[in-house]
Amino acid sequence: MDILTSTKGYEAYLRIELGREVVDEGLTEKRSEMRAGPFPFLRATYWRWTEIVLELAPELASAPKVLAVGDIHLENFGTWRDADGRLVWGVNDYDEAAEMPYALDLLRLATSGLLAGAEHKAEAIAEAILDGYAQGLEDPGPAVLDRKLAWLREAVMVPEGHRQEFWDKLKRKRKKFEVRTEAERPKLWPRYEAALRATLPPGSDEPRIWYRSAGVGSLGRPRWVAQAQWCGDWVVREAKAVVPSAWTRVHEAGGRSIRCIEIATGRYRAPDPWYRVIDGVAVRRLSPNNRKIETDKPLSREAEDGPEETLGRDVLLGRPMLEAMGRELASIHLATKDAGEDVRRDFAARGRAWLAKGAAVAAERIAAEQAEFAATPEVP
Protein backbone atom coordinates (compact mmCIF):
# COMPACT_ATOMS: atom_id res chain seq x y z
CA MET A 1 0.00 0.00 0.00
CA ASP A 2 1.42 3.42 -0.93
CA ILE A 3 1.18 6.54 1.23
CA LEU A 4 -1.71 8.06 -0.73
CA THR A 5 -3.86 4.96 -0.33
CA SER A 6 -2.84 4.72 3.32
CA THR A 7 -3.83 8.34 3.97
CA LYS A 8 -7.20 7.87 2.34
CA GLY A 9 -7.77 4.71 4.39
CA TYR A 10 -6.96 6.37 7.70
CA GLU A 11 -9.18 9.35 6.99
CA ALA A 12 -12.00 6.90 6.25
CA TYR A 13 -11.28 5.20 9.58
CA LEU A 14 -11.54 8.53 11.39
CA ARG A 15 -14.92 9.15 9.79
CA ILE A 16 -16.10 5.76 11.01
CA GLU A 17 -14.90 6.53 14.54
CA LEU A 18 -16.02 10.16 14.75
CA GLY A 19 -18.74 10.43 12.13
CA ARG A 20 -19.84 13.99 11.49
CA GLU A 21 -17.49 15.27 14.20
CA VAL A 22 -14.48 15.04 11.86
CA VAL A 23 -13.12 18.53 11.15
CA ASP A 24 -12.46 18.69 7.41
CA GLU A 25 -10.37 21.85 7.63
CA GLY A 26 -8.18 20.02 10.13
CA LEU A 27 -7.58 17.18 7.68
CA THR A 28 -6.64 19.74 5.03
CA GLU A 29 -4.20 21.35 7.46
CA LYS A 30 -2.73 17.95 8.30
CA ARG A 31 -2.06 17.22 4.65
CA SER A 32 -0.29 20.57 4.41
CA GLU A 33 1.89 19.62 7.39
CA MET A 34 2.67 16.30 5.72
CA ARG A 35 4.01 18.18 2.71
CA ALA A 36 6.13 20.52 4.84
CA GLY A 37 8.97 18.12 5.58
CA PRO A 38 9.93 14.67 6.92
CA PHE A 39 9.69 15.54 10.64
CA PRO A 40 6.16 17.02 10.52
CA PHE A 41 5.23 14.14 8.21
CA LEU A 42 6.32 11.66 10.89
CA ARG A 43 4.29 13.52 13.51
CA ALA A 44 1.21 13.63 11.29
CA THR A 45 1.20 9.98 10.26
CA TYR A 46 1.43 7.67 13.24
CA TRP A 47 -1.09 5.43 11.54
CA ARG A 48 1.38 4.91 8.68
CA TRP A 49 4.16 4.06 11.13
CA THR A 50 2.01 1.26 12.54
CA GLU A 51 1.58 -0.15 9.04
CA ILE A 52 5.26 -0.25 8.08
CA VAL A 53 7.42 -0.41 11.22
CA LEU A 54 7.54 -4.20 11.55
CA GLU A 55 8.33 -4.43 7.85
CA LEU A 56 11.28 -2.10 8.44
CA ALA A 57 12.43 -3.76 11.68
CA PRO A 58 10.93 -7.28 11.83
CA GLU A 59 13.39 -8.34 14.52
CA LEU A 60 11.64 -6.03 17.00
CA ALA A 61 8.37 -7.94 16.81
CA SER A 62 9.69 -10.44 19.37
CA ALA A 63 10.58 -7.81 21.99
CA PRO A 64 8.53 -7.98 25.21
CA LYS A 65 5.26 -6.09 25.01
CA VAL A 66 4.42 -3.18 27.29
CA LEU A 67 1.85 -0.42 27.43
CA ALA A 68 3.79 1.98 25.22
CA VAL A 69 3.34 5.59 24.11
CA GLY A 70 3.24 4.64 20.43
CA ASP A 71 3.25 8.12 18.90
CA ILE A 72 6.49 9.21 20.53
CA HIS A 73 8.79 11.84 19.02
CA LEU A 74 11.01 14.73 20.11
CA GLU A 75 8.11 17.13 20.63
CA ASN A 76 5.93 14.78 22.67
CA PHE A 77 7.42 16.00 25.94
CA GLY A 78 6.42 18.93 28.10
CA THR A 79 5.75 20.13 31.62
CA TRP A 80 2.82 20.13 34.01
CA ARG A 81 2.12 20.55 37.70
CA ASP A 82 1.37 17.45 39.75
CA ALA A 83 -1.16 17.16 42.58
CA ASP A 84 1.25 18.83 44.99
CA GLY A 85 2.08 21.68 42.61
CA ARG A 86 5.53 20.37 41.71
CA LEU A 87 6.89 21.03 38.22
CA VAL A 88 7.14 17.76 36.27
CA TRP A 89 8.55 17.05 32.81
CA GLY A 90 7.81 14.07 30.61
CA VAL A 91 5.67 12.58 27.87
CA ASN A 92 2.48 14.63 27.71
CA ASP A 93 0.41 13.13 24.90
CA TYR A 94 -0.92 9.61 25.25
CA ASP A 95 -3.55 9.46 22.49
CA GLU A 96 -2.01 6.44 20.74
CA ALA A 97 -1.03 4.39 23.79
CA ALA A 98 -1.31 0.65 23.21
CA GLU A 99 0.38 -2.64 24.05
CA MET A 100 3.28 -3.28 21.67
CA PRO A 101 6.98 -4.29 21.70
CA TYR A 102 8.81 -1.85 23.97
CA ALA A 103 11.60 -1.31 21.43
CA LEU A 104 9.23 0.42 19.01
CA ASP A 105 9.04 3.50 21.25
CA LEU A 106 12.84 3.73 21.23
CA LEU A 107 12.97 3.28 17.47
CA ARG A 108 10.40 5.96 16.75
CA LEU A 109 12.05 8.44 19.12
CA ALA A 110 15.45 7.91 17.49
CA THR A 111 13.91 8.16 14.02
CA SER A 112 12.31 11.48 14.94
CA GLY A 113 15.71 12.75 16.04
CA LEU A 114 17.23 11.90 12.67
CA LEU A 115 14.38 13.53 10.76
CA ALA A 116 14.46 16.68 12.89
CA GLY A 117 18.21 17.16 12.70
CA ALA A 118 19.78 15.78 9.55
CA GLU A 119 23.25 16.87 10.67
CA HIS A 120 23.08 14.63 13.75
CA LYS A 121 24.47 11.11 13.56
CA ALA A 122 22.23 8.11 14.15
CA GLU A 123 24.83 6.54 16.42
CA ALA A 124 25.00 9.56 18.73
CA ILE A 125 21.22 9.87 18.97
CA ALA A 126 20.81 6.16 19.61
CA GLU A 127 23.56 5.97 22.24
CA ALA A 128 22.06 8.80 24.26
CA ILE A 129 18.55 7.31 24.16
CA LEU A 130 19.82 3.84 25.06
CA ASP A 131 21.92 5.19 27.94
CA GLY A 132 18.88 6.99 29.30
CA TYR A 133 16.71 3.92 28.89
CA ALA A 134 19.25 1.82 30.79
CA GLN A 135 19.21 4.38 33.61
CA GLY A 136 15.43 4.25 33.71
CA LEU A 137 15.39 0.46 33.86
CA GLU A 138 17.75 0.66 36.82
CA ASP A 139 16.02 3.50 38.66
CA PRO A 140 12.59 4.40 37.23
CA GLY A 141 10.74 7.50 38.33
CA PRO A 142 9.22 10.80 37.23
CA ALA A 143 11.29 13.84 36.33
CA VAL A 144 10.27 16.19 39.15
CA LEU A 145 12.15 19.44 38.60
CA ASP A 146 11.70 21.44 41.80
CA ARG A 147 14.85 20.09 43.47
CA LYS A 148 16.67 17.98 40.87
CA LEU A 149 17.62 18.18 37.20
CA ALA A 150 18.51 21.88 37.31
CA TRP A 151 19.60 21.89 33.65
CA LEU A 152 16.21 20.56 32.56
CA ARG A 153 14.34 22.98 34.79
CA GLU A 154 16.31 25.84 33.24
CA ALA A 155 15.45 24.62 29.74
CA VAL A 156 11.68 24.37 30.31
CA MET A 157 10.98 27.29 32.65
CA VAL A 158 9.01 30.00 30.87
CA PRO A 159 10.73 33.42 31.01
CA GLU A 160 8.64 36.17 32.59
CA GLY A 161 8.45 38.11 29.35
CA HIS A 162 6.92 35.17 27.51
CA ARG A 163 3.92 34.50 29.74
CA GLN A 164 1.89 37.26 28.12
CA GLU A 165 2.45 35.61 24.74
CA PHE A 166 0.35 32.66 25.91
CA TRP A 167 -2.63 34.91 26.64
CA ASP A 168 -2.13 36.97 23.49
CA LYS A 169 -2.12 33.82 21.36
CA LEU A 170 -5.29 32.53 23.00
CA LYS A 171 -6.98 35.85 22.36
CA ARG A 172 -5.94 35.89 18.70
CA LYS A 173 -7.27 32.39 18.12
CA ARG A 174 -10.53 33.16 19.90
CA LYS A 175 -11.11 36.30 17.85
CA LYS A 176 -10.24 34.48 14.65
CA PHE A 177 -12.90 31.91 15.51
CA GLU A 178 -15.53 34.43 16.59
CA VAL A 179 -15.41 36.45 13.35
CA ARG A 180 -16.40 33.35 11.38
CA THR A 181 -20.06 32.85 10.63
CA GLU A 182 -21.91 30.00 12.28
CA ALA A 183 -21.90 28.11 8.99
CA GLU A 184 -18.12 28.48 8.64
CA ARG A 185 -17.25 27.26 12.13
CA PRO A 186 -16.64 23.64 13.12
CA LYS A 187 -19.62 22.40 15.12
CA LEU A 188 -19.34 22.25 18.90
CA TRP A 189 -20.74 18.83 19.66
CA PRO A 190 -22.35 18.36 23.09
CA ARG A 191 -19.81 15.91 24.53
CA TYR A 192 -16.93 18.39 24.11
CA GLU A 193 -18.80 21.21 25.79
CA ALA A 194 -19.88 18.87 28.59
CA ALA A 195 -16.31 17.66 29.16
CA LEU A 196 -14.96 21.21 29.26
CA ARG A 197 -17.60 22.40 31.70
CA ALA A 198 -17.08 19.34 33.91
CA THR A 199 -13.38 20.09 34.33
CA LEU A 200 -13.55 23.83 35.03
CA PRO A 201 -13.31 24.69 38.74
CA PRO A 202 -16.66 24.87 40.55
CA GLY A 203 -17.84 28.46 40.69
CA SER A 204 -16.19 29.51 37.43
CA ASP A 205 -17.94 32.19 35.42
CA GLU A 206 -19.64 31.27 32.15
CA PRO A 207 -16.83 30.13 29.80
CA ARG A 208 -16.04 31.30 26.31
CA ILE A 209 -15.53 28.25 24.09
CA TRP A 210 -13.87 28.11 20.67
CA TYR A 211 -12.32 25.68 18.22
CA ARG A 212 -8.54 25.39 18.38
CA SER A 213 -6.20 24.12 15.70
CA ALA A 214 -3.08 22.67 17.33
CA GLY A 215 -0.73 19.73 17.14
CA VAL A 216 -0.17 17.73 13.98
CA GLY A 217 -1.18 14.11 14.45
CA SER A 218 -4.57 14.97 15.93
CA LEU A 219 -5.59 17.43 13.19
CA GLY A 220 -8.99 16.45 11.90
CA ARG A 221 -10.23 15.53 15.35
CA PRO A 222 -12.31 18.14 17.19
CA ARG A 223 -10.29 20.26 19.64
CA TRP A 224 -11.96 22.94 21.74
CA VAL A 225 -10.84 25.44 24.37
CA ALA A 226 -12.81 26.89 27.27
CA GLN A 227 -11.65 30.03 29.09
CA ALA A 228 -13.39 31.26 32.22
CA GLN A 229 -12.86 33.65 35.11
CA TRP A 230 -12.28 31.97 38.47
CA CYS A 231 -11.02 33.45 41.73
CA GLY A 232 -9.70 36.61 40.13
CA ASP A 233 -8.15 35.41 36.87
CA TRP A 234 -8.49 33.14 33.86
CA VAL A 235 -8.48 29.36 33.84
CA VAL A 236 -8.23 27.42 30.57
CA ARG A 237 -9.11 23.86 29.58
CA GLU A 238 -8.65 22.07 26.26
CA ALA A 239 -10.73 19.13 25.03
CA LYS A 240 -9.97 16.89 22.06
CA ALA A 241 -11.32 13.65 20.66
CA VAL A 242 -9.53 10.38 21.30
CA VAL A 243 -10.15 7.22 19.31
CA PRO A 244 -8.69 3.71 19.64
CA SER A 245 -4.96 3.66 18.91
CA ALA A 246 -3.90 3.32 15.30
CA TRP A 247 -1.73 0.43 16.49
CA THR A 248 -4.78 -1.63 17.43
CA ARG A 249 -6.43 -0.73 14.11
CA VAL A 250 -3.58 -2.40 12.22
CA HIS A 251 -2.46 -5.16 14.57
CA GLU A 252 -5.78 -6.05 16.21
CA ALA A 253 -4.08 -6.33 19.58
CA GLY A 254 -5.52 -5.00 22.81
CA GLY A 255 -9.02 -4.40 21.52
CA ARG A 256 -10.53 -0.94 21.27
CA SER A 257 -9.69 0.25 24.76
CA ILE A 258 -8.51 3.85 25.09
CA ARG A 259 -5.62 3.65 27.54
CA CYS A 260 -4.62 7.30 27.92
CA ILE A 261 -5.37 7.51 31.63
CA GLU A 262 -3.78 4.15 32.40
CA ILE A 263 -0.44 5.17 30.89
CA ALA A 264 -0.57 8.76 32.18
CA THR A 265 -1.05 7.58 35.76
CA GLY A 266 1.37 4.65 35.71
CA ARG A 267 3.36 3.50 38.72
CA TYR A 268 6.39 5.68 38.03
CA ARG A 269 4.53 8.84 37.01
CA ALA A 270 3.74 12.09 38.85
CA PRO A 271 0.57 12.67 36.83
CA ASP A 272 -1.22 15.83 35.83
CA PRO A 273 -4.32 15.85 38.07
CA TRP A 274 -6.23 17.96 35.52
CA TYR A 275 -5.82 15.40 32.75
CA ARG A 276 -9.00 13.38 32.28
CA VAL A 277 -10.82 11.38 29.62
CA ILE A 278 -14.60 11.81 29.64
CA ASP A 279 -16.84 10.11 27.08
CA GLY A 280 -14.03 9.76 24.54
CA VAL A 281 -12.79 13.31 25.11
CA ALA A 282 -9.36 14.03 26.62
CA VAL A 283 -9.27 17.22 28.69
CA ARG A 284 -6.19 18.98 30.02
CA ARG A 285 -5.34 22.25 31.69
CA LEU A 286 -3.59 24.91 29.60
CA SER A 287 -1.32 27.35 31.38
CA PRO A 288 1.41 29.87 30.52
CA ASN A 289 3.62 28.07 33.04
CA ASN A 290 3.64 24.82 31.08
CA ARG A 291 6.03 24.42 28.20
CA LYS A 292 6.81 22.16 25.27
CA ILE A 293 10.05 22.67 23.37
CA GLU A 294 9.51 22.78 19.60
CA THR A 295 12.23 21.89 17.13
CA ASP A 296 11.91 24.85 14.77
CA LYS A 297 11.25 27.65 17.26
CA PRO A 298 13.72 29.66 19.35
CA LEU A 299 13.84 28.62 22.99
CA SER A 300 14.21 31.63 25.27
CA ARG A 301 15.76 31.07 28.68
CA GLU A 302 16.64 33.35 31.55
CA ALA A 303 20.37 33.95 31.98
CA GLU A 304 22.38 36.11 34.37
CA ASP A 305 22.84 38.82 31.74
CA GLY A 306 19.27 38.59 30.40
CA PRO A 307 17.22 36.23 28.22
CA GLU A 308 19.12 34.09 25.74
CA GLU A 309 17.79 32.14 22.77
CA THR A 310 18.66 28.72 21.42
CA LEU A 311 16.93 26.86 18.62
CA GLY A 312 14.67 24.23 20.16
CA ARG A 313 16.15 21.52 17.93
CA ASP A 314 19.59 22.05 19.43
CA VAL A 315 18.26 21.53 22.95
CA LEU A 316 16.10 18.53 22.07
CA LEU A 317 18.95 16.78 20.27
CA GLY A 318 21.50 17.46 22.98
CA ARG A 319 22.75 14.37 24.77
CA PRO A 320 21.27 15.29 28.20
CA MET A 321 17.78 15.74 26.75
CA LEU A 322 17.88 12.53 24.71
CA GLU A 323 19.03 10.64 27.80
CA ALA A 324 16.16 12.14 29.78
CA MET A 325 13.71 11.06 27.08
CA GLY A 326 15.07 7.52 27.13
CA ARG A 327 14.83 7.38 30.90
CA GLU A 328 11.25 8.63 30.77
CA LEU A 329 10.27 5.89 28.32
CA ALA A 330 11.76 3.21 30.57
CA SER A 331 9.81 4.58 33.53
CA ILE A 332 6.60 4.45 31.50
CA HIS A 333 7.25 0.92 30.22
CA LEU A 334 8.05 -0.51 33.65
CA ALA A 335 4.56 0.36 34.85
CA THR A 336 3.30 -2.61 32.80
CA LYS A 337 2.66 -5.40 35.28
CA ASP A 338 5.27 -8.18 35.29
CA ALA A 339 7.11 -6.72 32.28
CA GLY A 340 10.19 -5.42 34.07
CA GLU A 341 12.43 -8.48 34.10
CA ASP A 342 11.54 -9.48 30.56
CA VAL A 343 12.31 -5.98 29.27
CA ARG A 344 15.59 -5.77 31.18
CA ARG A 345 16.69 -9.18 29.92
CA ASP A 346 15.78 -8.42 26.31
CA PHE A 347 17.35 -4.95 26.43
CA ALA A 348 20.65 -6.40 27.67
CA ALA A 349 20.65 -9.23 25.13
CA ARG A 350 19.72 -7.05 22.16
CA GLY A 351 22.92 -5.03 22.32
CA ARG A 352 23.30 -1.50 20.98
CA ALA A 353 23.72 -1.53 17.21
CA TRP A 354 20.06 -2.21 16.40
CA LEU A 355 18.74 1.24 17.28
CA ALA A 356 21.03 3.38 15.11
CA LYS A 357 20.68 0.94 12.22
CA GLY A 358 16.90 0.73 12.55
CA ALA A 359 16.45 4.48 12.91
CA ALA A 360 18.49 5.12 9.76
CA VAL A 361 16.37 2.65 7.78
CA ALA A 362 13.11 4.08 9.13
CA ALA A 363 14.16 7.69 8.55
CA GLU A 364 15.06 6.90 4.93
CA ARG A 365 11.65 5.30 4.35
CA ILE A 366 9.76 8.16 6.01
CA ALA A 367 11.67 10.75 3.98
CA ALA A 368 10.91 8.87 0.75
CA GLU A 369 7.20 8.62 1.54
CA GLN A 370 7.08 12.29 2.49
CA ALA A 371 8.65 13.24 -0.83
CA GLU A 372 6.13 11.06 -2.65
CA PHE A 373 3.24 12.66 -0.79
CA ALA A 374 4.56 16.19 -1.28
CA ALA A 375 4.77 15.62 -5.03
CA THR A 376 1.02 14.89 -5.16
CA PRO A 377 -1.10 18.06 -4.76
CA GLU A 378 -4.25 16.30 -3.59
CA VAL A 379 -5.13 13.02 -1.94
CA PRO A 380 -7.27 11.17 -4.48
Predicted regions and their residues:
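Conserved ATP-binding subdomain of kinase catalytic cores across diverse folds
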Residues: M1-G26, S32-V69, L74-P159, R197-P380
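Sequence-structural signature of the catalytic-core scaffold of metal-dependent phosphohydrolases
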Residues: L137-Y192
